[in-house]
Amino acid sequence: MTFEWSAIWAAWPDLMAGSWMTIQITLLGLVGGTIIGALSGVVVTYVPVPVTRRTLAWSVVVLAAAVALLRLAAWLDAGPLAGVPDAAWWALRLAVLALLAWRFLSWIPLVLSFLSQVYILVIRGTPIVVQVMFIYFALPLLVNLRIDGFTAATVTLMINSGAYIAEIVRAGLQSVPKGLYEAGQAMGLPFHKILARIIGPVALRRMIPTMGNQCIISLKDSSLFIVIGVAELTRQGQEIIAGNFRAVEIWGAVAVIYLIMTGCIALALKYIEHRTRIV
């Protein structure tokens, strides 16, 4: 069997189209995943989840009392006190809702932290192929919404990479000495300024290698979206081979293109590490 370069040149436009699709999915997925991962990582790192039995019991009591008051108000409004103006009943309802908001507002960070940990556990514990199949085939049945292949692939990569980036962010933040956080508090800085000006720059330098590795993994994971027919690089290679039966040439070209893309990421990573290192 002879190696035919002409098969590669003939397929080159389709391979470039697949490469561009791969780059789009990867870039959009990583941008969205970085936002999700950064928020989840910060919440998981700085918000403790455990709730004491005492606070839980008081919360249940307050919730039960609020529900009872609302039901009592509805019964009185329809029966014995039907002549009371509606404004009075609405004022009572708003007061009860304000009480609930006051009691449970402090629980919002705890709920977010718990949900973030569940999200990370579920996504890291399931294959990305299962995730994209669920989003592309099962989710439209649940919400009655049509999702195209490109959107399903991009959203899946966002969700998948976000879980891993959250762990990268958590590890980076926890690697920073606690003394820096305490120093920021001693200076009277709010949390967001401590994170942005003191802890963030130090943690970011330590996260660069693992973030670069995650970028490469996400790029290669995009090839798995072949299962839903997205016209990325691997899918294009498969369709080309179905037409010309030149598997050696086409898969070789596909492999070289992936190596070039991952090599560019590695070079960019080395440049960023060089620019951000502390001399």
PLM regions with names:
Residues 1-279:
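Transmembrane alpha-helices and adjacent helix-loop boundaries
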